[in-house]
Amino acid sequence: MKFFAAAALFIAGVLAAPSPNAANSVTPLCNPGLYSNAQCCAVDVLGVADLNCATPPGVVNNAAEFQAACAKIGQEARCCVLPVLGQDVLCETPLGL
């Protein structure tokens, strides 16, 4: 009987502990798939083309940091399909914004 109680307490403690990956998990900035390129763009033309785009400066871990990093350089956070020489094709708003 004591063994069962001790085992139940041990198992309950293990299950209640947070997993080590939960604290370090990073939410994706953009949808996986087509719109997977995080970009800071100056001009959006109806979501079809974005002009003067570049990768976000520094390290960004979530949508709020992505938006703040782009705003700091006077640009807008976007997720695009095809970045080519600062012009991006088919862009959308990042996840979480």
Swiss-Prot record:
Quaternary structure annotation from Swiss-Prot or TrEMBL: Homodimer. Homodimers further self-assemble to form highly ordered films at water-air interfaces through intermolecular interactions.
TM region(s), chain numbering: none
Swiss-Prot/TrEMBL induction comment: Expression is highly induced in the presence of root and stem powder of Shanxin poplar, and slightly induced under carbon or nitrogen starvation.
Function: Aerial growth, conidiation, and dispersal of filamentous fungi in the environment rely upon a capability of their secreting small amphipathic proteins called hydrophobins (HPBs) with low sequence identity. Class I can self-assemble into an outermost layer of rodlet bundles on aerial cell surfaces, conferring cellular hydrophobicity that supports fungal growth, development and dispersal; whereas Class II form highly ordered films at water-air interfaces through intermolecular interactions but contribute nothing to the rodlet structure.
Keywords on record: Cell wall, Disulfide bond, Secreted, Signal
Primary location: secreted
Superkingdom of source: Eukaryota
Name listed for the protein in its UniProt record: Class II hydrophobin 3
SUPFAM superfamilies xref list: Hydrophobin II, HfbII
InterPro entries cross-referenced by the UniProt entry: Cerato-ulmin_hydrophobin, Hydrophobin_sf
Annotated compartments: Secreted; Secreted, Cell wall
Disulphide-bonded residues: C30-C79, C40-C70, C41-C53, C80-C91
Any one GO CC term of the record: extracellular region
Family stated for the protein in its record: Belongs to the cerato-ulmin hydrophobin family.
Upper classification of the organism: Eukaryota, Fungi, Dikarya, Ascomycota, Pezizomycotina
Signal peptide (residue range): 1-16
